Structures are given as C-alpha cells and as structure tokens.
C-alpha cells in the first residue's frame, strides 16, 4: 500500500471504533436513499472515487431504539488531497459547515465526534422535554422548533413558559401571561433564575418553577 492508503486505512479503522459511528465504502454518490445496502466492513475507503461514507446512529434511551441514521459523504480534493463534504443528511441546526471548517482536515475523528455529539444532545434535549410533559401534571408542550431550541409549555393555570435552549443549557426562560393569569415581576425573575442552566435536570427545575408560577390573578 502507498503511504496515503495506509493513512486512509488507519483513519477508517479509528472511526469504526467510535460508538454509533460507522465508516463505509461509497460506490455510488446517490447512496443516501440506499445507504443501508452499501455498508461494508472491507475496503471502506473508495480510492477510485476518493469517497468515504460516514453513518451516525443516535440512540433514544426512552424508547430503547436507534433513531433514523444520518449520513455524511466525504470526498477528497485531487488538488490538495483534503476532504470536503460532498453529500450529507445532517440537519441545518447542527451547523455542519462550521464544524467542517474547524475540524475536518485537522482531525477527522474530532469532526465526526462533534457532529455526533450535537445530534445526540438535540435528541437528549427532546427526551428531557418530553419527560417534563409526561412526568408533571398540568403542563403541556404546545410548540417547539425542529432543534428544540425554542419551546413553549402551556400550564393549566393559564400561564405559559417559553424556553430558549442551546445544545446543553436553558439559555433563557420567559413567563407568558394571559388575560386570565398574571404573575408579578419578582416571580417571573425567580422562574427565570430557576430554569436557566443545564437542561439535564429539567424535570426538577420545572417542579421548582411550578411552585412559583401560581398566578397573582386568575379568573
């Protein structure tokens, strides 16, 4: 094998050891709709077309099932021998271009693990938000964007609680009043203080916040 082929082989073997991440050969760039049939444990790097496929599987701890897989095809640039993203199914909210620029040709393992981590954190965020809804009475998740970065819960007392979340934390919380339910400024600030921070203890945060979110006026 040439030096480059040995490097490629080592790179692929390293990737396949990462949990939830699989490197595989890509013989057809239109693989995405048939990717499950293209995975192989041998000849993972397609030297002829300079293509490397990466599959990322995230696991839902609540349902005990893997989610629909995500895929990235990397292609090597003949001019500078560097990889670039040729095809992918990664959602926009993962900010793949940012990660590509920062890590791809400096540390491939780091690039892939960062993508996987972000996908896993969004799934974890979804699970925690759903757990709030199923664990606590009188609260319902009524609105959420695809990345669960902005979510709104309806309380049975007429108030709403809107959360802004990043990959690991509740960045902000806002109490939304209605004509029939009001809350003092001091209580709103206290709720905000309770809710901000890591979302890994979101159920506990909500339990504390609900004690505060008893309307000063309701009909």
PLM feature segments, named:
Residues 16-219:
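Charged, low-complexity assembly regions of eukaryotic complex subunits
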Residues 11:
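Carbohydrate-associated surface elements
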Residues 6-7, 219:
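Intrinsic disorder/low-complexity signal
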Residues 1-4:
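Internal amphipathic alpha-helices that form coiled-coils
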């Amino acid at each position: 094998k040439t030096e480059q082929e040995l490097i490629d082989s080592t790179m692929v073997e390293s990737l396949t050891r990462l949990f939830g991440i699989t490197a595989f050969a890509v013989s057809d760039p239109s693989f995405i709709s048939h990717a499950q049939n293209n995975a192989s444990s041998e000849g993972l790097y397609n030297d002829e077309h300079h293509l490397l496929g990466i599959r990322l599987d995230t696991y839902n701890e609540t349902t005990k099932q893997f989610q629909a897989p995500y895929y990235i095809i990397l292609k090597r640039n003949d001019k500078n021998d560097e990889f670039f993203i040729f095809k992918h199914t990664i959602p926009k909210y993962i900010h793949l271009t940012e990660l590509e620029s920062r890590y791809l040709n400096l540390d491939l393992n780091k690039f892939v693990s960062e993508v996987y981590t972000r996908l896993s954190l969004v799934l974890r965020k979804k699970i925690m938000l759903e757990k709030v809804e199923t664990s606590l009475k009188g609260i319902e998740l009524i609105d959420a964007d695809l990345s669960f970065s902005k979510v709104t819960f309806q309380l049975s007392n007429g108030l709403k609680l809107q959360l802004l979340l990043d990959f690991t934390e509740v960045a902000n919380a806002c109490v939304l009043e209605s004509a029939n339910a009001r809350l003092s400024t001091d209580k709103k600030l206290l709720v905000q203080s309770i809710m901000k921070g890591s979302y890994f203890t979101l159920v506990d945060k909500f339990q504390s916040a609900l004690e505060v979110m008893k309307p000063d006026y309701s009909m």
